Amino acid sequence: MTLWINGDWITGQGERRRKTNPVSGEILWQGNDANAAQVAEACQAARAAFPRWARQPFAARQAIVEKFAVLLEAHKAELTEVIARETGKPRWEAATEVTAMINKIAISIKAYHARTGEQKSELVDGAATLRHRPHGVLAVFGPYNFPGHLPNGHIVPALLAGNTLIFKPSELTPWTGETVIKLWERAGLPAGVLNLVQGGRETGQALSSLDDLDGLLFTGSASTGYQLHRQLSGQPEKILALEMGGNNPLIIEDVANIDAAVHLTLQSAFITAGQRCTCARRLLVKQGAQGDAFLARLVDVAGRLQPGRWDDDPQSFIGGLISAQAAQHVMEAWRQREALGGRTLLAPRKVKEGTSLLTPGIIELTGVADVPDEEVFGPLLNVWRYAHFDEAIRLANNTRFGLSCGLVSTDRAQFEQLLLEARAGIVNWNKPLTGAASTAPFGGVGASGNHRPSAWYAADYCAWPMASLESPELTLPATLSPGLDFSRREAV
């Protein structure tokens, strides 16, 4: 029984699915997808649970969410192992994901009060009050790269705001989704407040097409995000929050400390085997001897990165990709760029055929025409050389995406210029592109999102504002508007 609907664990009636470890091939999870009728049942359960959940005092909702945080801490080792085995990422990185999930609770509570709490302004004849109300029933679509943390970034603020939810994890990480939901069950969520439906495209389409949804919160690829946007077009009454990918530039302008710059680049491009939406995909390096030395050192150090199993001891910096098919897609993207005229500086290599272990690749594309403006979700870094800083900014902005952008430079003025001219939701200076703070918004422009950033701003799309003018009693104004006459006439 792998679906959780209205507080009950039930068996899916859709397609049979199994999840294997992307490196060892071990079967980790088996179950059936939710069919359309079960998806509708989950929505009905969420709708029925909404009035009571929304009317709960905030403190009552907060108490359950905080109990979930306690359970996450108590089961940190177990959840770390599930995430590591299911995604292929090393245990150390899976552990940081669970820590991020735990930290999200306190941050989301603070954000709720800061972004969507109650504010009151006293007036001469009463008060003006701002309150916030939950949308109702929301669908949450989770990604596979952070199958615990990223859905958590939607689920926690949505529950705090008083919404009820239907959660569909990625079909590539059903085990993590189920494990997290079992912790929510133990935290004491009332039946129907949070529902789990497993499945792939058909389940997702059934969920996103439900008439009774009040909104959809999505993290994933641009192609799926665009599809959801088209599907919900003409329905302005539904909130749609899209967090999509990027073709992110990292500008290397000043590399006086070459090893520090190389370390920052490795963290930006290859952490999580390149499977973070903020990962650097395009490396822009200034022409000249300093840039040459930086690239040579980058190729040298990156060439020593050996992806390992999730359970290796000592642990590796990167593990496997989410699947052998994902690794093959990266290889095909590299070969495509070579065919266009790219010069390979470091060839990616499959460590073992049939697994998702893939070494990093670096290819120079300076002067190459018609390079696809796409997000290759893996450890492939494209290099362009530039002559002056204005050209670097032009190259950085030469993308339909706008998620993250970074600069390595000792010149504050260059960073100030980048802040003014970059089209990206995250712009970092001498920090990895993959570094983000939950106390700040997280999102992008262009094909990277629809202006609904998450993290600190997630509270914004989980509730709508209600403005009120209030007075405890009704009195006739001392001064009337022109043309109004309230004088009493004598009876004839």
UniProtKB/Swiss-Prot annotation:
It is an enzyme of class 1 (oxidoreductase). Pathway: Amino-acid degradation; L-arginine degradation via AST pathway; L-glutamate and succinate from L-arginine: step 4/5. It comes from the Bacteria. Coiled coil: none annotated. CDD domains: ALDH_SGSD_AstD. It catalyses: N-succinyl-L-glutamate 5-semialdehyde + NAD(+) + H2O = N-succinyl-L-glutamate + NADH + 2 H(+). Its EC number is 1.2.1.71. GO terms for molecular function: succinylglutamate-semialdehyde dehydrogenase activity. NAD(+) binds at residues 220-225. GO terms for biological process: arginine catabolic process to glutamate; arginine catabolic process to succinate. The active site is at 243, 277. Keywords: Arginine metabolism, NAD, Oxidoreductase. InterPro entries: Ald_DH/histidinol_DH, Ald_DH_C, Ald_DH_CS_CYS, Ald_DH_CS_GLU, Ald_DH_N, Aldehyde_DH_dom, SuccinylGlu_semiald_DH_AstD. Catalyzes the NAD-dependent reduction of succinylglutamate semialdehyde into succinylglutamate. NCBIfam families: arg_catab_astD, PRK09457.1. Belongs to the aldehyde dehydrogenase family. AstD subfamily. This is N-succinylglutamate 5-semialdehyde dehydrogenase. It comes from Salmonella heidelberg (strain SL476). The lineage of its organism: Bacteria, Pseudomonadati, Pseudomonadota, Gammaproteobacteria, Enterobacterales. The gene is astD.
